UniProtKB/Swiss-Prot annotation:
Binds to actin and affects the structure of the cytoskeleton. At high concentrations inhibits spontaneous rabbit actin nucleation. This strongly suggests this archaea has a profilin-regulated actin system, and actin-type genes can be identified in this organism. InterPro entries: PFN_sf (IPR036140). Keywords: Actin-binding, Cytoplasm, Cytoskeleton. Inhibition of rabbit actin polymerization is reduced by phosphatidylinositol-(4,5)-P2(1,2-dipalmitoyl), a soluble form of the phospholipid phosphatidylinositol, suggesting an unknown lipid might regulate actin-profilin interaction in vivo. This is Odin profilin. It comes from Odinarchaeota yellowstonii (strain LCB_4).
């Protein structure tokens, strides 16, 4: 399965968009309905910054470590969930406001593990 197929397969239910970002900040895939600043996203992850901004929406980081990034918008505009793909890239997804970020993380992490084999 290709990178695009794996990342795109996540888009259903509560996950509305995905992106795969190399640790350099280079975006190697993003769903057509999303515009992500790859360098910013990687800096938030690496530096454990308190917030991430995607498409002008600020999300407060609630959990970040070497394996994951979980952020939520305090105004109820959804969540950002990310999992590391073998230390090579960060797979992030937008989770709808009614979605459960921790449940989405399980799906995203599983896909990130598959991505690590093809990156």
């Amino acid at each position: 399965m290709s990178l695009e197929q794996l990342a795109g397969r996540l888009i259903s239910g509560d996950i509305g968009a995905t992106a795969v970002i190399k640790m350099t900040g280079e975006i190697i895939y993003q769903s057509p309905n999303w515009s992500v600043d790859g360098v910013h996203a990687i800096n938030v992850y690496k530096n454990r910054e308190p917030s991430i901004i995607i498409q002008g929406v600020k999300y407060s980081v609630i959990d970040v470590n070497e394996d994951r990034l979980i952020a939520t918008n305090v105004g109820g505009q959804g969540h950002i969930v990310g999992a590391v793909a073998g230390g090579k890239a960060l797979l992030i997804g937008y989770v709808s406001p009614n979605g459960d970020a921790r449940t989405a993380y399980i799906q995203i992490d599983k896909t990130a593990r598959q991505l690590s084999k093809i990156l």
